[in-house]
Every structure is written in structure tokens, then in C-alpha cells.
Amino acid sequence: MKIQLSEHFTYHKLLRFVFPSIVMMIFTSIYGVVDGLFVSNYAGKTAFAAINLIMPFIMALSALGFMVGTGGSAIVAKTLGEGREKEANRYFSMLIYLTIFGGIILSILGILLARPVSIALGASGDLLDYCTLYGRITFLSLTPFMLQNVFQCFFVTAEKPKLGLLVVVLAGVTNMVLDYLFIAVFGMGLVGAAIATVCGECIGGFVPLIYFAAKNSSPFRLGKTKWYPFILKKTCTNGSSELMTNLSSSIVNTLFNFQLMRFVGENGIAAYGTIMYVNFIFVAIYFGYSIGSAPIVSYHYGAQNHKELKNLLNKSLRFTGICGIFMFILAQLIATPLARIFVGYDVDLFELTRHGFRIYCTTFLVCGLNIYGSSFFTALNNGLLSALISFLRTLVFQVSAVLILPIFFAIDGIWSSVLLAELLTLVVTAICIIKKRSRYHYF
């Protein structure tokens, strides 16, 4: 039976509703992992390092999609909760058109800047050529990639999370099958990986575009709209935390690469790339839960249902806390086989990766609480507070930690810097939740 945003959510009903979003994010991470797995084993560690070096730049330019998706869907869900369906649809249409326009501009910019940015990141020789080549090809699909991120949020708001999951699975399977064909069978190496990524992202972005452009059973259909500068401003403010998360992550990943290159060279970048791929799968559970539950929070906030807000917050904090314990234990158990699958062909790289992941995975214990805390305030249309949490978590604390800890603990200081940043952010998140309880009445 279809679950509606207006219902009271038990644990069972809440997990049923967010499950497609969690699976969607996990699957998105998995096909990214498969991409890296094929490149590492068939194209070599230089090509693998190139992807990890240029990826922060790609993700930085695509951050607009995350901002519009999370910030815009929160506003649209709140508008639905207030009973203004026509206005909600016009806001939706305007945001999609803006994403397309912005994506085209950023795609051109990315293609032009791929080589100079790679040089600035420290690439040279074959590493520079690989970075430039991969970046220029994948920037061709930046617009549909941004659309995919926007539509996945709106699928949940439209009470169609299963359809969003289906689109991601279709895009992911396309990417993985083409990875196998282009890299393993036809020997196209890094070019094959880039083309496979482009094809998968085009499906992920254009299939939802066609769905919402045609007559459908959701509350939304692309159509005529107006220019709503206030809604755009509110979307940017509301989604600023997600924008900050992606931009900051790109900056931090670049800084990690610099530090690792300084301490252990190219092997450090390859090891960090492996850890990040696996990390994406684990934290995808938190991001999927946050994406899936945010429209529920926004709807009940718009409907002024304070009792349900309290119910959602309590259940969500318990869920993310318990998940953190299980994920930490699982990560410790699978560290060795995962490192062997990715980089088992190089003994030194294998040991570096395994050791680094066992330290890094301690962050799973607490990062879910911070991810949900930031998302919760976005859903409450408090983008500034959400952005503050994200800014401190992904930039200030992580940058400080990765610069300071290696002075005392060398390479282990790099691996443990994220844990310190998450612990400091947890204190900030707890203070924000306690301080704002009288405003939102969730306690």
C-alpha cells in the first residue's frame, strides 16, 4: 500500500518509505566502485590515480545539482504540506529549467578547465594526460548528472521513491555493463570508463526528464512557470549545506591528495581512492535515509504537526546511531578482502590501503548523526544552520585536522583526521538541535 507524506510514521513505515532512497544511494555508490575496480585492475594504478585526482573538480562543478535537489524539494514539499499544489508544481518546473541551463554552462567550463586544473592539482606526464582525458569526456554528461541528482530528491517528494530507485538501477547497470565491455573486453582503458560513465549518467538524467515532461501520476509535471527570485534564493539558502558539503569535500579530497602525495607518493592517492570508493557505499546509507526522510519532515513542518516532527527526529537519531555501530564492525571485518580486490596486485599498496581503511572506518560510528542533523535542518527550511554544520564538518574541521595531525602522527594522522572532524561536528550538531527545540517544537 502506498505511503503518503501526511501519515504517522512508525519504525516499520518509516523504513519502508526511505528504503528505496537508501538502496538508490548504495547502488549509485556501487556502480562508482565497479568503475574504479575495472580501471584499477585493467588500466593500472596511474589511470586509477588520475580519476581520483580529477574527481574532486568534477564533483565541485556538479554540486549545483545537489543544492537544487535538496533545497528545492524541501520548499516544494513544504508548499504541498500547506495545500498549495499548483504553486509547488510551478516551483518544481522553474528549478528543473534552471538546472538544465546551469548544467550546460558548467559543462563547457569544465571541458575548458580540465587540463589547467589538473596541472594545478600536481599532475604531470601520463597522470596529467589521463586526468585531462577523463575529465573532458565525463564533463559531456554533467547536465544529465546534475538532473539525476535533482530528480532523485523530487521522486521522493512526489511519493515515487521506487521509481527513483528504478532509474538509478537502470543507469547503474548500464554503466557497469559498458565498463565490462569497454574496459575488460575491448581494452579501451580509461576512455572506456569515461564513456560508460557518460552513458549511465545520460540515462539517469534524461529518463526522469521524459517522465516528468509527460503526463504522469505524480503531483508534478514540467510545464509553464514564472520567474520566482524568492524561491530561487530560498532554494540556494536551503540547499547551501549540500552545496557546501560537495564543494568542501572536493577541496578536502584535493588536500588529502596533496598530503598523501607528499608522504607516500602515487600509492597514497590510489589507496585513498580505494578507501573513498568503499566509504561512499557505507555513508550512502546515511545519505539515502536523509534524502528519503527529508520530504516527510518538510511536509509535517509545513502542516505544523509538531508531534510528528518529534517522532521523526527521535526515530532517526536512534536509527543512525545503531547503524553506525554495525557499519564500523562490518568495515573492520571486510578491510582485508576489499583491499585485496582493488589493489591486490601491489603488495605495498595493498598494505597501505588495508591499514588506512581500518583507521578511517572509525568515522562510521558518528558521521551518520552529523549527516542527518544537517539534512534535518534543511528539511525544516533552515538552510543557514544546515550550512553551518556542513561547513564546519566538511571544511573547517577536516582541513584543520588533515594539516595538523600528520605533523605528529605522519600517515596515520591523515587517516584519522576525518574522525576528529566528525567528533567536533557532533558537538556542534547536538548544540544546534538543543538550541532550536523551542522554535521547531520537536522536543
Give names to the regions the model predicted:
Residues 16-35, 137, 148, 171, ...:
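Transmembrane helical elements of multi-pass membrane transporters/channels
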Residues 30-48, 118-125, 181-188, 250-281, ...:
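Helix-terminus/linker motif at the lipid-water interface of multi-pass membrane proteins
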Residues 1-18, 76-141, 185-240, 297-363, ...:
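Short alpha-helical transmembrane segments in multi-pass integral membrane proteins
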Residues 6-43, 56-71, 75, 79, ...:
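N-terminal transmembrane alpha-helices
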Residues 60-63, 175-180, 205-209, 280-284, ...:
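Hydrophobic transmembrane alpha-helices of multi-pass small-molecule transporters
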Residues 48-108, 145-164, 271-335, 367-389:
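Small-residue-rich hydrophobic transmembrane alpha-helices
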Residues 35, 72, 113-114, 151, ...:
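Hydrophobic/aromatic residues in alpha-helical transmembrane segments
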Residues 69, 137-156, 167-175, 193-206, ...:
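Short runs within selected transmembrane alpha-helices of multi-pass transporters and secretion channels
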